[in-house]
Amino acid sequence: ELTIYYCIDDLASSSPQAKRIRQSETRLLREADLVFVTSEKLRERAARVRHDVHRFPFGVNFTEFEQARHAATDPQDLKDLTGPIVGYVGGIRKEIDQELLRDVATRVPEATFVMVGPLQADCSRLRMPNMVFLGQRRHEEMPQYIRRFQVGIIPYLLNEYTAHIYPA
């Protein structure tokens, strides 16, 4: 029997219980048989406790993306969009830099900003004519959405928590 720790985020950096989380994580890092992390920053942090930390980023199904490149049809909710599409895929949470997004969307009114993912924060400030929130879509549909993006963005705030998110 093995104990495997797979760390995907720096949870302590965004929690009022940071000290307690860090103590628990240090104990887990010491006691686990194997440790995997999703980003280089997480690996560096975990390596302060133990040297044998393995970076194991999230995977991509390249076959699905290749098939999407040659798809004849677009997702129904993107069919009527004209002009360039600036897109984001992921949870629309408090880590999104809404001020930056609003500023860029205002400066580039000819582009449509498409946000694909569950709405997990108040984004009322982003209700603009060229900002579209599609909600969550199935994982296997993502290549078809991303194929339509002229620009892909990851509009995170810059802080301790987002510094450890993969991709970063």
PLM feature segments, named:
Residues 140, 144, 154-168:
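Nucleotide-sugar-dependent
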